[in-house]
Amino acid sequence: MAVTDFDTKVAVVVRGDLAGWQRLNVCAFVISGVTAAAGPAAVGEDYVDGDGNRYLPLLVQPVLIFEASADKLTTVRERAQRREVPIALYTADMFSTGHDSANRAAVRSAAAADLDLVGIALRAAHRDADAVLRGLRRHP
């Protein structure tokens, strides 16, 4: 199925100046937030191979990955807030923490405008997602 076959669009925006491992880490963490918030409707059934071994289910729809500068990530966060589109976020400070409560403390320590964003993910209706993501280019 294509992105347009779904009522919603799922997207990750990652900062372009990150190391490869950081980009992957950010994508993994922020998409977990989208999946948790979306609930069972966004997750498919278990995978089963030809030998009957079971594997965990995945999201049922494609995930679009975009690249952006730090300033553009701030713009994306602001647009999402204005349109009341829930987002998952990852900040640079979170690279130096080791657990969830420390991650939340890192985010709580900064005003929204001062967050050093390195990644954002969202799942929203196409129209809202397109408005929030306007002007971004797909990750190479």
Predicted feature descriptions by range:
Residues 1-140:
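Positively charged, small/polar-rich N-terminal and surface patches that mediate targeting and assembly
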